């Protein structure tokens, strides 16, 4: 019977670790597109912020120029300790141009080229929140020694796939990255002790993709037409085969939020050195 690696105990442990934050009166600046459907995520951030006595300063923008201006203003404001660009934004906007304007020491998403470069060199404190959550879950439940393990990351985004690859490699796992052009994915994934899937497609990973006793981390969050939230894994059919699996909802997402506030604390420490 598979171990269900729920996110709440992991997130609670991180919040406990972050209790020193409560006396610091930190502020997280959030910039979102006016009218976007990010309300649910913002609500989760708000609850976590209250728990840690963090103030949220939310700016809503309608034009790309407003976005870049808001980033610059918050970047110069000493009372703002971290900046988060809350997706989604219009597809035609140059998101990377805007995110690159965030000072590296205020980059709670850890996607600035400076922070990703340091991560690649193995000397970065800031790690993108979602892959940081993946490692936190694996460490908390301790179901698989990463050293020497065969790991497959499905998805190569700079927010999840790339940093997950770097972190797992630095933990001495043997890591392969798969993507939309990968040939014969099932035969590749059936060799993996650990599968991390982040493709944004409901029920993408089936029982044909996993070997018996593997560990599966489902990063996906997909809303079906009937409103049901599911992951990238066909959990009903995969779960009976594997040693451990994260649920959706209730898995990686809540830990990602906690890791975001951990990054805010690290940003503050960087700014006050």
Curated annotation (Swiss-Prot):
GO CC terms: cytosol
Pathways involved: One-carbon metabolism; tetrahydrofolate interconversion
Lineage top rank: taxon: Bacteria
One Pfam family linked to the record: THF_DHG_CYH
UniProt-annotated binding residues for NADP(+): 155-157, 180, 221
NADP among keywords: yes
GO terms, molecular function: methenyltetrahydrofolate cyclohydrolase activity; methylenetetrahydrofolate dehydrogenase (NADP+) activity
Gene3D superfamilies tied to this protein: Leucine Dehydrogenase, chain A, domain 1 (3.40.50.10860), NAD(P)-binding Rossmann-like Domain (3.40.50.720)
EC numbers: 1.5.1.5, 3.5.4.9
Keyword Thylakoid included in the entry's annotation: no
Keyword list, A-Z: Amino-acid biosynthesis, Histidine biosynthesis, Hydrolase, Methionine biosynthesis, Multifunctional enzyme, NADP, One-carbon metabolism, Oxidoreductase, Purine biosynthesis
InterPro entries the record matches: Aminoacid_DH-like_N_sf, NAD(P)-bd_dom_sf, THF_DH/CycHdrlase, THF_DH/CycHdrlase_cat_dom, THF_DH/CycHdrlase_NAD-bd_dom
Substrates-to-products reaction catalysed: (6R)-5,10-methylene-5,6,7,8-tetrahydrofolate + NADP(+) = (6R)-5,10-methenyltetrahydrofolate + NADPH; (6R)-5,10-methenyltetrahydrofolate + H2O = (6R)-10-formyltetrahydrofolate + H(+)
Subunit relationships: Homodimer.
PANTHER family for the chain: C-1-TETRAHYDROFOLATE SYNTHASE, CYTOPLASMIC, C-1-TETRAHYDROFOLATE SYNTHASE, CYTOPLASMIC-RELATED
Function: Catalyzes the oxidation of 5,10-methylenetetrahydrofolate to 5,10-methenyltetrahydrofolate and then the hydrolysis of 5,10-methenyltetrahydrofolate to 10-formyltetrahydrofolate.
Family named by the database record: Belongs to the tetrahydrofolate dehydrogenase/cyclohydrolase family.
Protein name: Bifunctional protein FolD
Species classification: Bacteria, Pseudomonadati, Coprothermobacterota, Coprothermobacteria, Coprothermobacterales
Gene name linked to the record: folD
């Amino acid at each position: 019977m598979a171990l269900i690696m729920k996110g709440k105990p992991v997130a609670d442990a991180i919040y406990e670790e972050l209790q020193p934050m409560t006396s610091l009166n930190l502020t997280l600046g959030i910039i979102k597109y006016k009218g976007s459907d990010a309300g649910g995520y913002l609500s989760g951030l708000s609850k976590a912020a209250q728990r840690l006595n963090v103030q949220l300063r939310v700016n809503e923008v309608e034009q790309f120029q407003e976005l870049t201006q808001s980033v610059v203003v918050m970047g110069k404001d000493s009372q703002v300790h971290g900046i988060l660009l809350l997706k989604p934004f219009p597809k035609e906007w140059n998101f990377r141009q805007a995110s690159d304007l965030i000072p590296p020491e205020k980059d709670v998403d850890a996607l600035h080229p400076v922070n990703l470069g340091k991560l690649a060199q193995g000397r970065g404190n800031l790690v993108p929140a979602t892959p940081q959550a993946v490692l936190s879950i694996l460490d908390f439940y301790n179901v698989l020694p990463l050293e020497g393990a065969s790991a497959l990351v499905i998805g190569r985004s700079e927010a999840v796939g790339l940093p997950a690859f770097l972190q797992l490699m630095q933990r001495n796992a043997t890591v392969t990255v798969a993507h939309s052009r990968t040939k014969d994915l099932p035969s590749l994934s059936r060799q993996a002790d650990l599968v991390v899937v982040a493709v944004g497609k409901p029920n993408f990973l089936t029982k044909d993709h996993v070997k018996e006793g593997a560990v599966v981390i489902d990063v996906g969050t997909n809303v079906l037409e009937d409103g049901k939230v599911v992951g990238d894994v066909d959990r009903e059919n995969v779960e009976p085969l594997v040693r451990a699996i994260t649920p959706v909802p209730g898995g990686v997402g809540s830990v990602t939020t906690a890791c975001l506030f951990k990054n805010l604390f690290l940003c503050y420490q960087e700014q006050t050195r």
